[in-house]
Amino acid sequence: GASKRGWTTWSIAAVDKRIVAIVPIVIDMLNVVPSFKHHYRAYGFYAPAVGDYVEMGIMGWQDTPEYKRLLEIVEPYEYLERYTMPKYLINASGDQFFLPDSWKFYYKNLLGQKHLRYVPNAGHSLDGSDAVYSLAAYYNAILNKTKLPEYDWDVQEDGSIKVTTKVRPKEVLL
């Protein structure tokens, strides 16, 4: 599911054992409070895309006990131990709601097989992008039980990305 339906993707995966894999799309906000605090610090304001939430005062609730209690129920990050199924997160590099480094608030804490893609030159709608092809490829791999690449990556102090693989790749395309 995409956007709000991406949130639903996380939510249903936390409670339904029939789910074999998930692909939340353009919902790059697990661990929502640090993510949105980072959003504000990066821009110095909340992006117009989240204006309705700002107008309703929701951003001002983030440090309240009531908001914390609400997140204990509805925040997918609260259920990390349940997301043991394969996960493919598809996000947009130019998302109007979420920053392209929001992964740093949750990705390393996800359990099991996980893959993350930021679709280049795409906004929240992913219009005009090739995202559907990577979704279809992942779907096909899950259905056919195709072994997917196993790797880990870390952003280094100098900004470079170090990738470690289980099997030496024959080729790497950037």
What residues fall within each predicted segment?
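Active-site nucleophile elbow and catalytic-triad environment of alpha/beta-hydrolase enzymes
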Residues: 29, 62-79
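Core-facing hydrophobic residues within beta-strands of well-ordered domains
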Residues: 19-20, 113-114, 169
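Acidic catalytic loop of the alpha/beta-hydrolase fold
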Residues: 94-98, 124-125
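Short alpha-helix in the alpha/beta-hydrolase fold that links the catalytic acid
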Residues: 99-107
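Glycine-rich nucleophile elbow surrounding the catalytic serine of serine-hydrolase chemistry
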Residues: 1-13
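Short beta-strand/loop motif that positions the catalytic acidic residue
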Residues: 83, 89-91
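Surface beta-strand/loop "capping" patches
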Residues: 130, 136-173
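Hydrolase active-site cap/lid region
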Residues: 11-60, 117-120, 125-130
